[in-house]
Regions:
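DNA major-groove recognition helix of helix-turn-helix
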Residues: 61, 177, 184, 188
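Structural recognition of an alpha-helix C-terminal capping motif at a helix-to-coil junction
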Residues: 59-66, 79-91
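Short, charged helix-capping/linker segments at alpha-helix termini
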Residues: 24-34, 44-63, 71-77
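A short pre-motif secondary-structure segment
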Residues: 148-152
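Intrinsic, short, N-terminal disordered tails of RNA polymerase sigma-factor systems
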Residues: 1-38, 97, 105, 111-124, ...
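Residues within the DNA-recognition helix of helix-turn-helix
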Residues: 39, 176-179
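Arg/Lys-rich amphipathic alpha helix in sigma70-family domain 2
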Residues: 74-76, 87-108, 127
Length: 199
């Protein structure tokens, strides 16, 4: 799937280049495209946390990559490409929901747990069941809490980068994260101290 997305990205770059040759041939440096391709698994994971669907997530990531490639000349070197792309994905998702008359704040599920790598036999089954419980608990969180958990605890963004992606103050990120951890801890029968780590 990721190879297919990388091929799509190369195709998108070619199509965008043909549409705007003066902007993209010179302005989309190879390192930009290379880093963008390397981020595809993380972008897809974030998009899936928003959409609840692998197919819709792939469409969202493709649209975000197209937009990023068209705007590559506006990307500021030295800033985090991942945070910029997460923000593009989130904004496209919200715009899409609004275009279809849906409320972006409504609950959208996260897909069922994927297989757990590097585990076998009973350990794999237990880890997969635990992952399924965690994903189900995350899916039950309000959207604002789910976004913060995914960006900070799963994608590894700092509070500052998460605040930038979500366009909220850092204090809001911290309070949403604390509430999300408390709700997850309650749902999983543990304490917030044992929840996912900080960045």
């Amino acid at each position: 799937m990721l190879d297919e997305m990388a091929n799509r990205l190369h195709m998108v770059k070619g199509v965008a280049s043909a549409a705007h040759p003066s902007r993209l041939d010179a302005s989309v440096p190879s390192p930009f495209a290379t880093e963008l391709i390397a981020l595809l698994p993380r972008l897809r994971r974030f998009a899936r946390s928003l959409t609840g669907s692998a197919d819709r997530a792939d469409d969202l990531v493709q649209a975000a990559c197209e937009r990023a490639l068209r705007a590559a000349d506006r990307f500021e070197p030295g800033t985090r490409l991942d945070a910029w792309l997460f923000r593009i994905i989130r904004n496209l998702w919200i715009d899409g929901l609004r275009a279809h008359g849906q409320d972006p704040s409504r609950h959208l599920p996260i897909e069922a747990a994927e297989a757990v790598p590097n585990a076998d036999g009973p350990a794999r089954i237990e880890a997969t069941l635990t992952l399924a419980k965690v994903r189900a608990a995350i899916a039950e969180l309000p959207e604002q809490h789910r976004e913060v958990i995914v960006l900070v605890c799963i994608e590894g963004l700092s509070y500052r980068d998460t605040a930038e992606v979500l366009d909220v103050p850092i204090g809001t990120v911290m309070s949403r994260l604390a509430r999300a951890r408390a709700k997850l801890a309650e749902a999983l029968g543990t304490t917030p101290d044992q929840m996912l780590g900080d960045r």
